[in-house]
Amino acid sequence: MKEKIVIALGGNAIQTKEATAEAQQTAIRRAMQNLKPLFDSPARIVISHGNGPQIGSLLIQQAKSNSDTTPAMPLDTCGAMSQGMIGYWLETEINRILTEMNSDRTVGTIVTRVEVDKNDPRFDNPTKPIGPFYTKEEVEELQKEQPDSVFKEDAGRGYRKVVASPLPQSILEHQLIRTLADGKNIVIACGGGGIPVIKKENTYEGVEAVIDKDFASEKLATLIEADTLMILTNVENVFINFNEPNQQQIDDIDVATLKKYVAQGKFAEGSMLPKIEAAIRFVESGENKKVIITNLEQAYEALIGNKGTHIHM
């Protein structure tokens, strides 16, 4: 059986100083060239990705054009928009590479919904800033229209709306994603952590929240029974005591040791810690599961064991 891999692309893979579609597509073109050897391998591949800058721009556009005739779309719908947009860009560049290689593989995007628990305590403590900055006066007006919304000051730059970041419970499209990935298809899924939804009677309803991309990627990898979760970030390896005089590079580590480092506070919250927590969950989800954390440039070398941080039981 060919190895099945979920590749979680970090925001740096599609980040650019310019926010134009052309600039972002150029960044994605460069990024996908780094994954070309993986596309040429027999591995079955699912790609997840972030959407922070893109959904931020969408929310600003929605706010600025909001009117009776062009009402602003809610966060869950903007999440779907960003999945389609970034998925389209990724498809275009991956298809270009597959054509150059004369490959018979195909690529496609699944707009992905992620179930969350409406009773998740994280809903009581929204922390994820989204959308544009507002003045104090603007916030006072907004809260008349949105009494349940929470706004917090953001490092002296103004006020921003904050939403919850609940844990993913299930990926609604995981069976479809698995079926496609088990063929010759490269699947793009769980963009931006997926669209958070809650079960309501006999259907699902979108909620105003943002799911951590690494947690969503771990849940997806577990549900489709992937062998490897590869988390691509902006560093080649995981370090303990990062940016300190006594920083130490990790090349290979077991989960038991990793848990000790987590308990000792060796990883920064909001940056490496969620990746480490996702790695632990995936490795513990079944036998012979492994996680690789590295940067985009070393993805293939890491997969064959030459680079990156390798996490296992």
UniProtKB/Swiss-Prot annotation:
Alphabetically list the UniProt keywords: Arginine metabolism, ATP-binding, Cytoplasm, Kinase, Nucleotide-binding, Transferase
Please report the organism this UniProt entry assigns to the protein.
Answer: Staphylococcus aureus (strain bovine RF122 / ET3-1)
Q: Write down what this protein is called.
A: Carbamate kinase 2
Task: Note the superkingdom of the native organism.
Answer: Bacteria
- Location(s) in or outside the cell: Cytoplasm
Q: Which reaction does it catalyse?
A: hydrogencarbonate + NH4(+) + ATP = carbamoyl phosphate + ADP + H2O + H(+)
Molecular function (GO) terms listed?
ATP binding; carbamate kinase activity
Keyword flag Transferase: yes
Q: Which family does it belong to?
A: Belongs to the carbamate kinase family.
In short, the EC number is: 2.7.2.2
